[in-house]
A protein has these predicted regions:
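Short C-terminal tail/terminal secondary-structure segment
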Residues: 2-8, 157, 235-236, 247-261
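Conserved glycine-rich cofactor-binding loop
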Residues: 16, 23-25
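Conserved glycine-rich Rossmann-like NAD(P)H-binding loop of the short-chain dehydrogenase/reductase
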Residues: 37-54
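Substrate-binding pocket helix/loop in short-chain dehydrogenase/reductase
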Residues: 108-109, 116-121, 147, 216
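Active-site helix of classical SDR
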Residues: 132, 168, 176
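Alpha-helical segment proximal to the catalytic Tyr-Lys
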Residues: 137, 181-185, 244
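Residue(s) in the substrate-gating loop at a strand-loop-helix junction
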Residues: 152
Length: 261
C-alpha cells in the first residue's frame, strides 16, 4: 500500500552540497536554492574575490556555519582531490554534488582552434568526471549520495558555431548514465538537468541581440527566456530523498523547446 509523500522528503537540512562554478549566474542560484532548502553549501570558483563576495552574501542570509567556499580548478585533478578531502574533513561528508561549472566558445567549426575545443570539453565534460569521481568515492563507501550534472538543451540538440559545447553537453548526458550504471547499486543517484535558454548576466548579450532573442522566443513554446529560478526546484528535487528512485535521467527545463519542431 502506497502512502502520500511528505514535503519533508524535499528537506535538505543536515546535507552538505558542493556546487561547482557557483560564484555567479546559474550555479549561484542553485547553491542559494539548496541553502534555502536547508543544505550546508560549499561554493566553488576560481575567482577568489567573487567567490568570497558570494559567500559573504550567502552567510548573511543563511548563516556563517552553513556557507563555505573552496577555490579550485575543476579541471585539475590534484586540486580537486585535495579540495574534496579538505571539505569532507572540515565541513562534512559531501551528500550532494552539483556539477555546474561550464564555459562557452562561439566560432564556426572550420575556424575553431584545437586549444579552444579542448578548453570547452575539459570544463564542460571532463570536470564532471574528475569532480564526480572524487566525490563519488566517499558516496559509494557511505552508500548514499546525489549527483546533479547541469547539461543543456544542447545535450539533445545542436546549433551552429558551438560544436565543442554541444559535444561536451551531449557527452555529459551519457556520463550521467554511466554514473548511474556504475554507482546506482551503492545507492548513489546521478541525474542531469538540461536548461533551455536562461537569461543571466552571461547571456545578456544574446538577449540584447534582436534576431537571436526573436529566435528564442519563437522557438520556445513558453515564449520566454528561462530564469535561474526555473532550475532551482528540479535541483532541490534531484538532491533530495524525493528522487531516490530516479537515476541516470536528464530532465529538460527548457520551456518545451526540445518537445517541438
Amino acid at each position: 500500500m502506497s502512502t502520500p509523500m511528505s514535503t519533508a522528503a524535499f528537506d535538505l537540512t543536515g546535507r552538505v552540497a558542493l556546487v561547482t562554478g557557483s560564484s555567479r549566474s546559474i550555479g549561484r542560484s542553485l547553491a542559494d536554492g539548496l541553502a534555502a532548502a536547508g543544505a550546508t553549501v560549499v561554493l566553488n570558483g576560481v575567482d577568489r574575490a567573487r567567490l568570497d563576495a558570494t559567500r559573504a552574501d550567502f552567510a548573511a542570509r543563511h548563516g556563517e556555519k552553513r556557507v563555505h567556499a573552496a577555490a579550485f580548478d575543476v579541471t585539475a585533478e590534484d586540486q580537486v582531490v585535495a579540495a574534496v578531502a579538505a571539505i569532507e574533513a572540515e565541513v562534512g561528508p559531501i551528500d550532494v554534488l552539483v556539477n555546474n561549472a561550464g564555459v562557452q566558445h562561439r566560432v564556426p567549426m572550420l575556424d575553431l582552434e584545437l586549444a579552444d575545443w579542448r578548453r570547452v570539453v575539459d570544463v564542460d565534460l571532463t570536470s564532471a568526471f574528475i569532480v564526480g569521481r572524487a566525490v563519488a568515492r566517499g558516496m559509494v563507501e557511505r552508500r548514499r549520495g546525489k549527483i546533479v550534472n547541469i547539461g543543456s538543451v544542447q545535450s539533445e540538440l545542436a546549433r551552429a558555431t558551438i560544436a565543442p559545447y554541444t559535444s561536451a553537453k551531449g557527452g555529459l548526458r551519457n556520463l550521467t548514465r554511466a554514473m548511474a550504471a556504475e554507482w546506482g547499486a551503492a545507492n548513489v543517484q546521478a541525474n542531469s538537468i538540461a536548461p533551455g535558454y536562461i537569461h543571466t548576466e552571461m547571456t545578456q548579450n544574446l538577449v540584447d541581440d534582436e534576431d537571436f532573442n526573436a529566435w528564442v522566443l519563437g522557438r520556445t513554446p513558453a515564449a520566454r527566456w528561462g530564469s535561474c529560478a526555473d532550475l532551482v526546484g528540479p535541483t532541490i528535487w534531484l538532491a533530495s530523498d524525493a528522487s531516490d528512485y530516479v537515476n541516470g535521467q536528464t530532465i529538460f527545463v527548457d520551456g518545451g523547446m526540445t518537445a517541438v519542431v
